[in-house]
C-alpha cells in the first residue's frame, strides 16, 4: 500500500526514548485538511536509567580492571620465568608454593642472607605489590576524591619513611600497620597503607645491596636491572599523537585538529560569545550591550578570577529593575552566579606568581600564541617529560618547571586554532559567533550540503556527542525514511523536541524536581481552593486553580486598578478574568508569566494593547505608576515583573521567539533536514520547530487530553498537533485571538465577524485544522477499530475514513546485542556448589536481617549471632548505621564481615572452578518444539563469550542439570531478543505483544502490550507460560508499526 502523489506535512515529536509521528494531508495553500497516518516508535534510551551514566562506562571500567589484572599477571609471569632461568627458583618451588611470610622476609633480608627460595619470594612480592607512581608533579591538585585519598596515603607514608624509625616500606608495614591496626593491606575504600613506587624501588636497591654484602650469589647487576625494569614499567598514558588520532577535526577547517579548551584563543572565544550574547531586560524591553558597556567589561575576567552577574550589574550601573535574560532568578542570590571564569588564564598566572615569576607572567600575558601553545601542551601530553619536550625552545625552562607543578588540562572544543584566529577579530567587534561564521565561511554549521536527497542521510555522529540525542535522531531518521518510502517526499517537516532532549542527566533531574515542585504547589492550591470553596460541587478545573494562584501571587489585588478582589467571588461568572498582559495575538505568549488576574470591569477596554499602552505609560500617568507599584510589590518572579512592565514590543520578534524552539538540538535537526532532505513545499524554508509551550496550548484548545502515564500513544497526539501548527493556522489563530481581545462580547455571544484586512469571516470558535478534528484524532490515536468507529461517530466526515486508516500499533526497536557483562561482579565460594549452596563474605555494613539468618555456623557461634542481631535491632535494621562503629566478639576480636549461605542453582564458575558468580543477563532465548510442547533455551553473555551454544531447555523449579535436552526430536522454531514481537495462543487467552524477558525459575516469559497500556496485565506486563501453548509465533514489525509479518523458519544461528 504505497502512494507518491500525496501532499503532506510530516509531524514529529521527539523524546529521549520515543518518536511520535503523523502524516497530515494539506491542500494547495498548505492548510491541513486530514489525518492520513499516525504512529509511535519506542526504543531504549542510550544511558543507564537510574544514574544517567553512559552505557559504555561500566564496560569501560570493567575492561580497564581486566587489563590491569592481566598486566599484573603477565608481569609476574615474566618475573617467574626470569627467576627460573637464573636458577633462583625451580618449577617444583613454584608448584609447592613459596614462603608466605614475604613482609617478614623483606625485613629479614636487611639483616641476614636469604635462601634462594626466600629471595625469590621477596622479589616476586615486590613486583606484585609495587605501590603507586605518579607521572605528573601536580597530580595532588586533583578534584577526584578517591585519587586524592590515595595520594594523601602515599605522601603520608613517604613522610614516615624519611624518619630514622623505618628503613623500608616493609619495616613500616610490620612495625606500624600490623602492630597498631592489626593488618598490613588496605581495607575497604582506604588507601592509608599505599606506598610510593619510588620508595619500593629504594627498598629493592637496599635489599640487593645488603644481600650482596651477605654473600647472596643471586644479586648480580643484570638481575637487579631486570627486576627494576619490571617494578617500574608502566603503560604510557594516552598522549600526543594518540590523542590527536581520536580528537577529530574542526567544524570549519576540515584539515585542522580541534583546539584545546584551555588555550587563550578558546577561552577568549567563550568569553566573547557570552559577552556578545548577553541580554538585559529592563522595563520589559530586551537589549544587547552597547559598545561602551562591552569595553567596560571586556578586560574584567582577566583581572579577577571570577566575574559574577552582580559584578556586571555594578560595573554597568544597571537599575534595580534591570535583570539578566536566561538567569534563573528563582534561586536565592541568583546574581552571585559566575558569568565568566577564565580558568586556564588564572591557573597559569597563579602558577608563575607562586614561583616568583610575576614579571615573566606580565610579559607572557601579552603573547596569546604562546599561551595557546601552553594550553595545547598541557591538554595533549600527560607526562612531564612529553610536556617539557613540546615546550622546549618555545618558553623558558623556568616557566615550564613552574607550570608543571600546577597545571593539568584536558578537553577540546569543536573549532581549531586556525578557525578561532579568523573568527575572533569579528567577535571583538561585537558580532555573534553565527554572524562571524557566515561572514567568513558563509554558514554557521560549516560547509553546507549543496544537494538534497529523497531519503535523509545518516546523522553525523561526530557532531552529536550526546549518545541519548544521537540515538533519538538516528531512530527519527529511520522513521522519516520509512514514511517517505510509503508516502513520498513531504512538503514540510514540523518537529517538536522534548524539553529533556539534549539535557544532561543532572539537568533533567533538576527539571524533574522543578516539575515536582510545581505539582506540589498546584496540589496545595487545589487543597486550599477546596477548603475555601467547600460547597464547590465538582473537582476544580485548571482554570479555577490558575485564578487562585494568580490571586495569591498578586496579594488579592487587580493589577490594572489596584482594587481588592473578593476571593469568595472568584468562581462567579463575569467577576474576574485571566488576561494575557502582553496580548496573545501580538506575542503568542501563553506562559504563566504573561497571565494576570483582573476584574472583568477593568479589562473591557484594554483590547489588544499592552498595559504600558493602555495605562498610558508613555506619559507616565498615575494609572501606570500605580500598576508599576503593584507589580513590583507582588510575589511575581523577576522575569514576570519584567514581562508585565514591557514598554516596547516588536510583534514579529515576540511571535517568532515564542513560536520557535531555538535550542541547539532543534536548530541542528532543522538545518540538517532543510539542507539534506528533498522537501516539495512551496516555501523557501519548509522545516518548523515549534516551541513546546505552543504545542501544549494548541493541544489544550483543541480539546486533546494527553495522559502520559497510561500508555505510549500520547506521543502520536503531540505529533499531530505539531504537524497542524502551520503558518496559515497560526494566522487564523492570531486573527481569532485579536478579534476576541478587541470584541470579547461578540465571542461570548457567538457572533461572526469579517476581518477588515483579509475580508475573511472569523468564526466565534477557536480555529481547528478541520471539522470534527478532535473527534477524528482521538479515534485514530486511541481506538483499536478506527475504521468502524469513524463510520459510526463521524458520518458527516466520510473523508476521514480512507485506505490508510488502521489501528495505531506502537513499534519498538528490538535489542539484538549479544555482548556485555559476562557475570555479576560478586564472586562466591563454590565449595558447596554440589549441595546447591554458595558462601559469600558480607561486610557488616551491608548485613541485612535476612542475610544474618543465613550466617555460616550460626548454631556454633550463638553469641556472635545474638550480638549482631541485637546491634541491628538497636539501629532499626540499618546495617550502615549499626556497624558504623567497630563490633567485637566476646573475646575482644573485631568482626568486620561474616560468611553467609545462599541458594545457588546456577552460575558461572570462575577462578579455576573455586568461585561461582551469578549469571548476568539473558541475551537470547531460543524456542524449540518437542512432542507438541514449547521449550525455551536461555543463552547468557558468558556463553556467547566462550562460543557455547547451550542445548538444555528450562524445566520449571528444577536445577539446570535436570533441564530437558533438546535432542534430535526437538525442532528449532526461532530466537527471541528483548522487544521482539510475538503472538501466543493458549487454551484460555490470546497475547500479541512484545517479549521483555524470561524467568528461568518458572520458564514463564514476560510480554508487554504494544503501547505499554498500564491498565492491562500487571502494569502493562503479562507473565505467561508457553510450554502448553496452542501456538507461539514470532513477528517482524517495521519502524512504523504497519508491516507485521510472521518470521519465516530458519536454521538456529551460532552465538559467535
UniProtKB/Swiss-Prot annotation:
Q: Which sites are catalytic?
A: 13, 580
Organism in which the protein naturally occurs = Pasteurella multocida (strain Pm70)
Which GO terms label this protein's molecular function in UniProt?
A: DNA binding; endonuclease activity; metal ion binding; RNA binding
What NCBIfam families does the entry give?
cas_Csn1 (TIGR01865)
User: What S-S linkages are listed for this chain?
Assistant: none
Question: Under which EC number(s) is this enzyme classified?
Answer: 3.1.-.-
> Domains: what does the record tell us?
Has 2 endonuclease domains. The discontinuous RuvC-like domain cleaves the target DNA noncomplementary to crRNA while the HNH nuclease domain cleaves the target DNA complementary to crRNA.
What does the UniProt function comment say about this protein? CRISPR (clustered regularly interspaced short palindromic repeat) is an adaptive immune system that provides protection against mobile genetic elements (viruses, transposable elements and conjugative plasmids). CRISPR clusters contain spacers, sequences complementary to antecedent mobile elements, and target invading nucleic acids. CRISPR clusters are transcribed and processed into CRISPR RNA (crRNA). In type II CRISPR systems correct processing of pre-crRNA requires a trans-encoded small RNA (tracrRNA), endogenous ribonuclease 3 (rnc) and this protein.
The record's similarity note reads: Belongs to the CRISPR-associated protein Cas9 family. Subtype II-C subfamily.
- What name does this protein carry? CRISPR-associated endonuclease Cas9
All residue ranges annotated as the HNH Cas9-type domain in the record: 504-659
Binding partners and assembly:
Monomer. Binds crRNA and tracrRNA.
Biotechnology section: The simplicity of the Cas9-gRNAs RNA-directed DNA endonuclease activity may be used to target and modify a DNA sequence of interest.
Record: residues binding Mg(2+) 1: 13, 496, 500
InterPro entries recorded for this chain? Cas9, Cas9_alpha-helical_lobe, HNH_CAS9, HNH_nuc, RNaseH_sf, RuvC_III
User: What biological-process GO terms show up in the record?
Assistant: defense response to virus; maintenance of CRISPR repeat elements
Give binding positions for Mg(2+) 2: 13, 500, 715
The cofactor named in the record is:
Mg(2+)
Entry keyword set? Antiviral defense, DNA-binding, Endonuclease, Hydrolase, Magnesium, Manganese, Metal-binding, Nuclease, RNA-binding
Amino acid at each position: 500500500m504505497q502512494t507518491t502523489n500525496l501532499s503532506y506535512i510530516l509531524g514529529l515529536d521527539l523524546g529521549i526514548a520515543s518518536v511520535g509521528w503523523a502524516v497530515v494531508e494539506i491542500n494547495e495553500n498548505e492548510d491541513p485538511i486530514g489525518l492520513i497516518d499516525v504512529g509511535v516508535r519506542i526504543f531504549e534510551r542510550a544511558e543507564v536509567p537510574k544514574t544517567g551514566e553512559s552505557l559504555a562506562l561500566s564496560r569501560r571500567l570493567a575492561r580497564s580492571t581486566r587489563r590491569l589484572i592481566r598486566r599484573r599477571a603477565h608481569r609476574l609471569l615474566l618475573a617467574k620465568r626470569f627467576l627460573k632461568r637464573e636458577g633462583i627458583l625451580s618449577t617444583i618451588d613454584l608448584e609447592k608454593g613459596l614462603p608466605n611470610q614475604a613482609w617478614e622476609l623483606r625485613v629479614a633480608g636487611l639483616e641476614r642472607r636469604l635462601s634462594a627460595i626466600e629471595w625469590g619470594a621477596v622479589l616476586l612480592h615486590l613486583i606484585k605489590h609495587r605501590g603507586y607512581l605518579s607521572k605528573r608533579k601536580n597530580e595532588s591538585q586533583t578534584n577526584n576524591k578517591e585519587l586524592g585519598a590515595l595520594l594523601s596515603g602515599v605522601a603520608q607514608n613517604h613522610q614516615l619513611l624519611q624518619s630514622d624509625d623505618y628503613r623500608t616500606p616493609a619495616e613500616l608495614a610490620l612495625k606500624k600497620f600490623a602492630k597498631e591496626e592489626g593488618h598490613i593491606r588496605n581495607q575497604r575504600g582506604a588507601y592509608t597503607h599505599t606506598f610510593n613506587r619510588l620508595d619500593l624501588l629504594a627498598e629493592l636497591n637496599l635489599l640487593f645491596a645488603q644481600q650482596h654484602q651477605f654473600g647472596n650469589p643471586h644479586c648480580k647487576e643484570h638481575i637487579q636491572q631486570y627486576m627494576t625494569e619490571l617494578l617500574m614499567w608502566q603503560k604510557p598514558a594516552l598522549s600526543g599523537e594518540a590523542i590527536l588520532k581520536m580528537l577529530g577535526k574542526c567544524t570549519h577547517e576540515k584539515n585542522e585538529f580541534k583546539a584545546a579548551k584551555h588555550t587563550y584563543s578558546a577561552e577568549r572565544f567563550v568569553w566573547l560569545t557570552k559577552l556578545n550574547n548577553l541580554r538585559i531586560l529592563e522595563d520589559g524591553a530586551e537589549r544587547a550591550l552597547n559598545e561602551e558597556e562591552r569595553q567596560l567589561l571586556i578586560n574584567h575576567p582577566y583581572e579577577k578570577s571570577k566575574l559574577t552577574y552582580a559584578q556586571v550589574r555594578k560595573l554597568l550601573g544597571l537599575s534595580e529593575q534591570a535583570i539578566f535574560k536566561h538567569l534563573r532568578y528563582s534561586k536565592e542570590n541568583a546574581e552571585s552566579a559566575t558569568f565568566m571564569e577564565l580558568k586556564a588564564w588564572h591557573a597559569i598566572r597563579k602558577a608563575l606568581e607562586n614561583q616568583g615569576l610575576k614579571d615573566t607572567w606580565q610579559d607572557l600575558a601579552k603573547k596569546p600564541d604562546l599561551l595557546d601553545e601552553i594550553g595545547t601542551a598541557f591538554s595533549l601530553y600527560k607526562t612531564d617529560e612529553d610536556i617539557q619536550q613540546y615546550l622546549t625552545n618555545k618558553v623558558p625552562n623556568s616557566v615550564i618547571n613552574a607550570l608543571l607543578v600546577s597545571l593539568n588540562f584536558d578537553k577540546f572544543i569543536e573549532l581549531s586554532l586556525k578557525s578561532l584566529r579568523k573568527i575572533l577579530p569579528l567577535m571583538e567587534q561585537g558580532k555573534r559567533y553565527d554572524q562571524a561564521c557566515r561572514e567568513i565561511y558563509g554558514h554557521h554549521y560549516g560547509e553546507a550540503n549543496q544537494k538534497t536527497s529523497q531519503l535523509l542521510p545518516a546523522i553525523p555522529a561526530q557532531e552529536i556527542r550526546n549518545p541519548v540525542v544521537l540515538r533519538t535522531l538516528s531512530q527519527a531518521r529511520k522513521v522519516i525514511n520509512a514514511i517517505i518510502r510509503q508516502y513520498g517526499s513531504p512538503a514540510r517537516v514540523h518537529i517538536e523536541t522534548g524539553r529533556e532532549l539534549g539535557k544532561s542527566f543532572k539537568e533533567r533531574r533538576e527539571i524533574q524536581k522543578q516539575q515536582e515542585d510545581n505539582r506540589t504547589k498546584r496540589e496545595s492550591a487545589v487543597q486550599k481552593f477546596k477548603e475555601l470553596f467547600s460547597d464547590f460541587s465538582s473537582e476544580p478545573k485548571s482554570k479555577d486553580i490558575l485564578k487562585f494562584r494568580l490571586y495569591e501571587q498578586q496579594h488579592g489585588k487587580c493589577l490594572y486598578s489596584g482594587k481588592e478582589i473578593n476571593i469568595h467571588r472568584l468562581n462567579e461568572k463575569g467577576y474576574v478574568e485571566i488576561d494575557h498582559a502582553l496580548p496573545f495575538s501580538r506575542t503568542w505568549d501563553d506562559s504563566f508569566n504573561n497571565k494576570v488576574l483582573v476584574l472583568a470591569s477593568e479589562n473591557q477596554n484594554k483590547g489588544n494593547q499592552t498595559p504600558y499602552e493602555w495605562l498610558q505609560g508613555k506619559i507616565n500617568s498615575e494609572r501606570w505608576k500605580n500598576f508599576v507599584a503593584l507589580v513590583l510589590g507582588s510575589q511575581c518572579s523577576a522575569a514576570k515583573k519584567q514581562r508585565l512592565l514591557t514598554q516596547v514590543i516588536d510583534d514579529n520578534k515576540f511571535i517568532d521567539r515564542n513560536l520557535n524552539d531555538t535550542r541547539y538540538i532543534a536548530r541542528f535537526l532543522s538545518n540538517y533536514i532543510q539542507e539534506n532532505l528533498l522537501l516539495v513545499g512551496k516555501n523557501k524554508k519548509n522545516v518548523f520547530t515549534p516551541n513546546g509551550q505552543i504545542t501544549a496550548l494548541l493541544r489544550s484548545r483543541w480539546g486533546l487530553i494527553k495522559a502520559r502515564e497510561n500508555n505510549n500513544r500520547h506521543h502520536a497526539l503531540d505529533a499531530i498537533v505539531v504537524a497542524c501548527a502551520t503558518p496559515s493556522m497560526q494566522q487564523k489563530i492570531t486573527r481569532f485571538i485579536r478579534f476576541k481581545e478587541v470584541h470579547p462580547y461578540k465571542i461570548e455571544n457567538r457572533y461572526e465577524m469579517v476581518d477588515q484586512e483579509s475580508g475573511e469571516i472569523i468564526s466565534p470558535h477557536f480555529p481547528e485544522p478541520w471539522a470534527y478534528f478532535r473527534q477524528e484524532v482521538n479515534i485514530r490515536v486511541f481506538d483499536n477499530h478506527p475504521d468502524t468507529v469513524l463510520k459510526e461517530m463521524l458520518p458527516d466526515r466520510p473523508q476521514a475514513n480512507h485506505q490508510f486508516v488502521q489501528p495505531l500499533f506502537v513499534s519498538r526497536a528490538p535489542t539484538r546485542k549479544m555482548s556485555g557483562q559476562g557475570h555479576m561482579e560478586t564472586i562466591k565460594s563454590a565449595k558447596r556448589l554440589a549441595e546447591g549452596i554458595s558462601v559469600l563474605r558480607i561486610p557488616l555494613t551491608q548485613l541485612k536481617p535476612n542475610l544474618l539468618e543465613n550466617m555460616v555456623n550460626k548454631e556454633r557461634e550463638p553469641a556472635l549471632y545474638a550480638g549482631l542481631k541485637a546491634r541491628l535491632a538497636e539501629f532499626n535494621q540499618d546495617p550502615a548505621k549499626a556497624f558504623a562503629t567497630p563490633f567485637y566478639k566476646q573475646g575482644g576480636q573485631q568482626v568486620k564481615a561474616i560468611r553467609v549461605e545462599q541458594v545457588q542453582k546456577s552460575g558461572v564458575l570462575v577462578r579455576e572452578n573455586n568461585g561461582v558468580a551469578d549469571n548476568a543477563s539473558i541475551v537470547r532465548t531460543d524456542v524449540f518444539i518437542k512432542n507438541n510442547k514449547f521449550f525455551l533455551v536461555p543463552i547468557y553473555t558468558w556463553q556467547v563469550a566462550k562460543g557455547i551454544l547451550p542445548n538444555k531447555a528450562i524445566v520449571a523449579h528444577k536445577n539446570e542439570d535436570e533441564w530437558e535436552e533438546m535432542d534430535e526430536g526437538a525442532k528449532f522454531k526461532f530466537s527471541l531478543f528483548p522487544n521482539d514481537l510475538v503472538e501466543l495462543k493458549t487454551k484460555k487467552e490470546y497475547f500479541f505483544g512484545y517479549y521483555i524477558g524470561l524467568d528461568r525459575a518458572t520458564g514463564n516469559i514476560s510480554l508487554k502490550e504494544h503501547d505499554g497500556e498500564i491498565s492491562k496485565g500487571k502494569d502493562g506486563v503479562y507473565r505467561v507460560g508457553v510450554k502448553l501453548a496452542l501456538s507461539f509465533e514470532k513477528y517482524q514489525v517495521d519502524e512504523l508499526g504497519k508491516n507485521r509479518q510472521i518470521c519465516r523458519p530458519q536454521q538456529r544461528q551460532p552465538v559467535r
